[in-house]
A protein has these predicted regions:
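Conserved P-loop NTPase catalytic core
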Residues: 348-375
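Flexible phosphate-sensing "switch/lid" loops adjacent to ATP/NTP-binding sites
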Residues: 1-322, 327, 344-347, 370-371, ...
Length: 502
């Protein structure tokens, strides 16, 4: 079987739009009839996903795989770093935890991971026609270039042609692109086949003189000017923007606590799309106010975030709301916090042995251990008022929770999962709201409590919504990028039947 062709997208900075451009290219190539896979050698992210075989990978490559119409595969993201403190991360290699590592130690040792990276890439290259590779940050970070395994270092290892993208929305895009090219070594510059200006607003004609000068100075063609697209697709940078939302502008007010180490807050994107649910992220008791429900999300450090919750007064405020009957939902680490006790006998979570009291809103006890549970799950909710709702989710956690009360749902194998007591609910299942059934029942429950007619809403399924948004993204890029040049950079001819509708 012939080895796949590849194209790599690098950026002038973090947030230039690499992830979404890669998703767009995955979608476009798949639409053009190719078997496509995304690849990012090393990803740093708060949000992760569990594959069908129980391995953990970054969500950016999951979205790109969905764009390509293929099953997410841990080979697409062999190295995942999940920040657990300001100076260190959990290091995940090929979907398995290697351990906690300070940043300085990881930088010293990361080149030892090159065999894992190449094994994953070469395996993908045997199974697909095109690999769309995403870089990280900027390839011109002088202090990081010597041990680079994710930008030009990776491009050299897999002989990848490179597209360099700059973000005009932040200003200074010509300096970004020219400066990045100038800081590269001659052999690295030779890998760049074209430049892309991303997130443009307005009349592209205004840019023509600047584009001509940029091409003259860099000796590189501009492959396209991509407009600021409104596609609602998760990527690590836009997800961080979502955390800034402070005001609910819909009839129902859902307050999600923005924990210092919040993770997998992609769980709540389906709620954001519901026409009646206003989702906002809060960090203070003043911001919390009196919402229609409170959600405690997942976290990369349950113990530290529980202590933060206690110190800033949110624990007392949430407990008071729960006593008044306000619904409270905890997911993963948030679920653990809602219980009676959290024991860390080996210092797995907090670095030293200790036992903490939880919020005491659920009859559960959690004990942390080194082994992480990673699995996809199907479940049926057994607790009112959501009884009968079917959902599919995944678990990523180290704690084991003992439940004395009623479970929230039952897994496909008959195992009880989660806990419910009154209007307080807890579960380990990430992705629970991707099920349209549970989202609708959750919204209807809040509507009934507030005297709102839930029939006023007619939401679409998240799967349908994501498909629409991916198609919107692909169309926007297809119409503004010289795809013939992109194909030529890979040594391929653009399929005639689709063409490029510029």
């Amino acid at each position: 079987m012939s080895k796949a062709k590849c194209i790599m997208v690098q950026g002038t900075m973090s947030g230039a739009g690499k992830s979404l451009l890669c998703a767009a290219l995955c979608r476009i190539f798949a639409q053009d009839g190719w078997r496509v896979a995304p690849f990012k050698s090393q990803n740093m992210a708060l949000n992760s996903f569990v594959t069908r075989d129980g391995l953990e990978m970054g969500r950016a490559q999951v979205v790109q795989a969905q764009a390509a119409g293929v099953e997410p595969d841990v080979r697409m993201n062999p190295i995942l770093l999940k920040p657990s403190s300001d100076i260190g991360s959990q290091v995940i290699v090929n979907g398995e935890v290697r351990g906690q590592m300070p940043a300085a130690e990881y930088f010293r040792r990361k080149k030892q991971l090159i065999p894992d990276i190449l094994a994953a890439y070469n395996s993908l290259a045997e199974d697909f026609d095109i690999i769309v590779i995403e870089g990280a940050g900027s390839p011109a970070e002088i202090n990081l270039k010597a041990d680079d395994i994710v930008n030009m270092g990776l491009a050299k290892l897999v002989d990848a042609p490179v597209l360099l993208v700059g973000d005009i929305d932040r200003g200074g895009v010509f300096a970004q692109l020219f400066g990045t090219v100038e800081l590269l070594e001659p052999d690295e510059r030779a890998r760049i086949k074209g430049l892309i200006i991303n997130k443009f607003r307005g009349d592209v004609g205004i840019l023509r003189p600047g584009l001509a000068m940029l091409e003259e100075k860099t000796h590189l063609p501009v492959f396209g000017v991509v407009p600021y697209l409104k596609a609602d697709i998760e990527d690590e940078d836009s997800l961080s923007d979502r955390l800034q939302v402070k005001n609910a502008v819909k009839p129902l007010d859902a307050a999600i606590v923005r924990l210092p180490h919040i993770s997998n807050f992609t769980d709540f994107m389906p709620l954001e799309q519901h026409p009646l649910l206003g989702v906002r992220y809060v960090q203070t008791t003043r911001e919390l106010g009196a919402p229609d429900c409170v959600i405690l999300p997942g976290t990369k450090n349950t113990v530290d975030d529980l202590l933060w919750l206690r110190q800033c007064g949110l624990e007392a405020a949430i407990s008071k709301l729960a006593q008044r009957g306000t619904p409270v939902l905890g997911v993963c680490g948030g679920y653990q916090m809602l219980g009676q006790t959290l024991a860390d006998p080996e210092g797995t979570e907090s670095g030293r042995p200790q036992t903490l009291r939880g919020l005491g809103l659920l009859p559960t006890q959690t004990t942390f251990a080194a082994e992480k549970r990673r699995t996809q799950s199907q479940a049926t909710v057994t607790a009112e008022p959501f009884a009968g709702a079917h959902l599919t989710g995944y678990e990523i956690h180290t704690g084991r929770t003992t439940v004395q009360g009623a479970p929230l749902c039952t897994l496909a194998d008959g195992t009880p999962e989660g806990c419910v007591q009154g209007q307080v609910f807890g579960t380990y299942l990430h992705g629970l709201f991707d099920s349209g059934e549970l989202t609708e029942q959750f919204a209807a429950y809040l509507c009934r409590r507030k005297g709102i007619d839930p029939a006023a809403a007619a939401p679409i399924s998240m799967q349908e919504y994501r498909t629409q948004q991916l198609d919107l993204l692909a169309d926007g890029v297809r119409h503004n990028l010289d795809l013939a040049a992109v194909y030529a950079a890979m040594g391929l001819a653009q399929p005639a039947e689709r063409g490029n509708d510029q």
